[in-house]
């Protein structure tokens, strides 16, 4: 047989196996998840009184965990720190309960080894990075129980963890929990000592709580009346898992419906031919699914009779539609629709992009998609916004793989575009279509940059997710420009997966990509996604059917890649990456045009010119080059600021060129008065249409717009005041620069400059006169807003929480400004002499008779040395700041700070590169002109390709 026949045969066998467990009389179901140490430890702690003695009911499970402790004292699970901590806490508790076991005299020593491991591991645990089900309840519960044995731990996030625990407990309605099934039944072991398990027997289903061995074990431990149903359930699960290794249990059993629905929906989504997959078997599955959906009145949970959830319900409804047993989505919509997205179930901590992607996919398969148009647009907006506001890849709370969210989002969003291309869903706005397009291309860009040399993206299941994503996003016409490279990547991935398909290796810890209390893998899912990835047509849809996206230039991405590819920093990057950044930048252009300017319309000029078409590339490419992606929203925020800075600065340069010293002194006073008034910038002052705005009005409009920017309003007053101060000093420094230029013109360039030393001018006026410092402070205001938004408190915290950190950051800003000023001067020497703008090499330190720099080349070499020095000082200052930050904000948040610094720094490095390139272009052009050739024409600071020849010399606007 060929690969296609083999794929369908594997899919057919999988469905027949799952269907047999579903419909065979007497079957209690099926589950192919790996066994877990955590759940096995809970079962090992179950005891009951027999003949007046307390006896452990499942001693064989304790033997298993006893024999599988690792050399460092831990039980590692998938190898992640959090799983090792949770597993080891549960096993340590089991060891303490079994200490009297005479047949295992080394239990105390083993317990000490576990304690030693936990003492170290808990110090390294950043709970803000953790995504596990109910960890904020489970870990405190285990710690409290260990306290009763005299075992306690102190670690940095202990207080925060217990505050989260107390906050969650305070919100619980125990009477409601005791009354009926809820999602909390899945983790009731976290409430030992709080919950009254005697009030819960009526919630058992087939002897278990939500198919969860750990909760069922906790119930047997704490209920005063023994329940044979629960004991029989646990014994049965141990028997089922005997082939996996003696006397263990998984985190979930049975998973019959979960495995059927997830596996079959994946096979359908990726174009498996159901006619080759035993249609009668599929029909029996559909009838059973419909039976339980009817019983649940249009919704159901992952096990019949358990809490309804949107994930299972949405996928089941979609399957019934394609299997010709349709059921209305009405009850589903009523149950799960929220104001801005669809919820998975009550009590969830946060919304899920994968759940909403599944809901969107399901509604797009409804017989009449337009009936649910408002819900479809709502979910699509939510999913697109998640991608729009996320830096890097989007991770989800149900799967550790960064590609799982990409797969489900791409399937739903591309299907949305396909339906819209058919003439449906007419209320979708052009803005939403644009964001969907950007989201999809963001996925493909990040996947292409992450493929490993063997063609994979990690384990086989993760690689399947990535390949399915590529298949869907390859349907976009924007991918035509990189189609050849895309095909190479896909062939490499298929070769990797084909070898796995035929070899069928045993599951490894790295295959545990699904998130529960600990991570786990599911054999049927691995098979289904593997078959799906190898079968999916690429592209999934004909690009010609995706016709309703806003059109973009087919030539601009190539222009961008070609031009910026000449820069030293981009030369090592392969052509396809440079072209990918060009496509992303081209997609971002319309979004920038959609945002109102922060300046007056009369001041705004050239916003649609080549310079502004090039701007997005100059932010996207440096961040992509160094693997420090920023969100599309963050990208747009930066671009809006750069555009406003450019236009404001350019307007002031043009209109102040003939200003007198008196004019400049008057303007300085107005600036100081404006910024000294605490009520300034609280309201927006308009300018009559019949006149141009004055200089102070332009400055006031810029400052007002920036300080009232919507996405910094939750930044603290201290953070916004720092931004206010940077804006004031920037404009005052610009005036000081103008005053220096007047002196130069009056005195002449051949006269030695006297007054402020070059060092002091560089670190005060020069550093203040760099717009990059405003961009850096503004970026941290954006982060401060995000931090406070996530905290959800009216008590706004500073982005740098201590006096030391504030001082260090301001020191970084000063060094960064000095470096940028010197670098700008280095690349503007010729122009500054031509235009009579003050440049570093005009200071007496460079021009004096004893300076040792009596030639232009020597002066330039000296300035280059200073640039290198200030760059090192800036590097060292930022590095020290980051070192001091981590203990205060945690490793995860510290990475956000680092990314801001890196992206700002790389953006400056790009202008450094651009300056060198432009100097070479101008030099070559002059040589060609002297020979009578055309060369590269320079007009108004533009090369013939339309980009700025250098950064703005007089005010350093783009540093």
UniProtKB/Swiss-Prot annotation:
This protein's pathway: Secondary metabolite biosynthesis; terpenoid biosynthesis
Region (Class I diterpene synthase): 543-959
Cited Gene3D superfamilies: 1.50.10.160, 1.50.10.20
Compositionally biased tracts (Low complexity): 934-959
Single Gene Ontology MF annotation: isomerase activity
Entry keyword set: Isomerase, Lyase, Magnesium, Metal-binding
Positions of Mg(2+) 2 binding: 649, 653
Region (Class II diterpene cyclase) location: 1-542
Name of this protein: Bifunctional premutilin synthase
Naturally occurring in which organism (per UniProt): Rhodocybe pseudopiperita (Clitopilus pseudopiperitus)
Gene: ple3
């Amino acid at each position: 047989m060929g690969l296609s026949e083999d794929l369908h045969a594997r899919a057919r066998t999988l469905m027949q196996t799952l269907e047999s467990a579903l419909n065979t009389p007497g079957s209690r179901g099926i589950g192919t998840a790996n066994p877990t140490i955590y759940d096995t430890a809970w079962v090992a702690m179950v005891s009951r009184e027999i003949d007046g003695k307390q006896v452990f009911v499942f001693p064989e499970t304790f033997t298993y965990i006893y024999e599988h402790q690792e050399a460092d004292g831990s039980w590692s699970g998938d190898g992640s720190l959090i799983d090792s901590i949770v597993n080891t806490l549960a096993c340590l508790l089991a060891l303490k309960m079994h200490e009297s076991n005479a047949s295992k005299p080394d239990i105390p020593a083993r317990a000490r080894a576990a304690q030693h491991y936990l003492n170290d591991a808990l110090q390294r645990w950043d709970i803000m990075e953790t995504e596990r089900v109910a960890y904020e309840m489970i870990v405190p519960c285990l710690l409290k129980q260990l306290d009763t044995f005299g075992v306690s731990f102190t670690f940095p996030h202990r207080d925060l963890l217990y505050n989260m625990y107390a906050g969650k407990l305070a919100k619980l309605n125990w009477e409601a929990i005791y009354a009926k099934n809820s999602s909390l039944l899945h983790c009731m072991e976290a409430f030992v000592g709080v919950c009254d398990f005697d009030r819960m027997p009526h919630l058992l289903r087939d002897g278990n709580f939500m198919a969860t061995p750990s909760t069922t074990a906790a119930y047997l431990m704490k209920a005063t009346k023994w329940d044979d149903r629960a004991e029989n359930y646990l014994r049965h699960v141990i028997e089922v898992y005997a082939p996996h290794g003696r006397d263990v249990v998984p985190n979930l059993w049975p998973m019959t419906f979960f495995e059927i629905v997830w596996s079959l929906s994946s096979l359908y989504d990726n174009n498996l031919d159901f006619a080759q997959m035993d249609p009668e078997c599929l029909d029996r599955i559909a009838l059973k699914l419909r039976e339980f959906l009817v019983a649940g009145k249009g919704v159901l949970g992952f096990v019949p009779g358990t809490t309804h959830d949107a994930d299972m319900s949405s996928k089941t409804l979609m399957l019934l539609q394609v299997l010709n047993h349709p059921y209305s989505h009405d009850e589903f919509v009523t149950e799960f629709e929220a104001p801005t997205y669809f919820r998975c179930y009550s009590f969830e901590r946060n919304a899920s992009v994968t759940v909403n992607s599944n809901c969107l996919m399901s509604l797009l398969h409804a017989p009449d998609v337009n009936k649910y148009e408002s819900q479809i647009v709502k979910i699509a907006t939510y999913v697109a916004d998640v991608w729009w506001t996320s830096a890097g890849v989007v991770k989800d709370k149900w799967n550790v793989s960064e590609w799982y969210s990409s797969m489900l989002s791409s399937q739903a969003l591309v299907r949305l575009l396909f339906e819209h291309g058919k003439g449906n869903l007419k209320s979708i706005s052009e803005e939403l279509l644009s964001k969907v397009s950007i989201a999809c291309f963001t996925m493909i860009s990040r996947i292409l940059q992450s493929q490993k040399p063997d063609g994979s993206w990690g384990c086989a299941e993760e690689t399947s997710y990535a390949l399915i994503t590529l298949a869907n996003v390859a349907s976009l016409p924007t991918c035509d420009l990189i189609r050849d490279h895309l095909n190479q990547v896909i062939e490499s991935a298929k070769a990797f997966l084909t070898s796995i398909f035929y070899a069928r290796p045993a599951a490894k810890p790295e295959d545990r990509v699904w998130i529960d209390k600990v991570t786990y893998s599911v054999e049927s899912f691995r098979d289904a996604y593997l078959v799906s990835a190898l079968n999916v047509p690429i592209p999934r849809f004909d690009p010609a059917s995706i016709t309703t996206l806003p059109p973009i230039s087919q030539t601009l991405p190539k222009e961008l890649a070609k031009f910026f590819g000449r820069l030293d920093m981009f030369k090592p990057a392969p052509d396809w990456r440079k072209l990918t950044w060009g496509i992303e930048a081209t997609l971002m252009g319309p979004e920038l045009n959609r945002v109102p300017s922060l300046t007056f319309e009369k001041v705004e000029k050239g916003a649609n010119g080549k310079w502004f078409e090039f701007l997005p590339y100059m932010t996207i490419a440096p961040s992509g080059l160094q693997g420090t992606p920023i969100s599309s929203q963050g990208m747009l925020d930066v671009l809006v600021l750069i555009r406003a800075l450019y236009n404001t600065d350019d307007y002031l340069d043009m209109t102040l060129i003939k200003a007198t010293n008196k004019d400049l002194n008057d303007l300085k006073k107005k600036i100081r008065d404006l910024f000294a008034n605490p009520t300034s910038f609280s309201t927006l002052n308009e300018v009559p249409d019949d006149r141009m705005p004055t200089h102070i009005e332009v400055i006031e409009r810029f400052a007002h717009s920036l300080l009232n920017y919507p996405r910094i309003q939750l930044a603290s007053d201290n953070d916004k005041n720092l931004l206010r101060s940077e804006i004031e000093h920037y404009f005052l420094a610009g005036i000081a620069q103008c005053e220096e230029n007047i002196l130069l013109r009056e005195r002449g360039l051949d006269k030695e400059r006297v007054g402020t030393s070059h060092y002091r001018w560089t670190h005060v006026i020069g550093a203040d006169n760099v717009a990059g410092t405003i961009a850096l402070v503004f970026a941290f205001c954006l982060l401060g807003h995000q931090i406070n938004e996530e905290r959800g408190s009216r008590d706004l915290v500073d982005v740098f929480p201590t006096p030391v950190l504030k001082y260090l950051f301001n020191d970084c800003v000063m060094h960064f400004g000095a470096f940028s000023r010197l670098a700008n001067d280095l690349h503007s020497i010729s122009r500054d002499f031509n235009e009579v703008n003050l440049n570093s090499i005009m200071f007496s330190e460079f021009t004096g008779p004893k300076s040792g720099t009596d030639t232009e080349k020597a002066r330039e070499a000296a300035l280059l040395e200073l640039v290198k020095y200030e760059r090192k000082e800036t590097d060292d200052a930022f590095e020290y700041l980051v070192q001091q930050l981590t203990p205060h904000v945690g490793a995860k948040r510290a990475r956000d700070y680092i990314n801001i610094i890196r992206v700002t720094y790389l953006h400056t490095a790009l202008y450094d590169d651009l300056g060198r390139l432009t100097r070479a272009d101008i030099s070559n052009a002059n040589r060609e002109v002297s020979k009578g050739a055309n060369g590269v024409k320079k007009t108004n600071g533009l090369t013939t390709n339309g980009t700025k020849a250098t950064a703005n010399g007089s005010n350093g606007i783009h540093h």
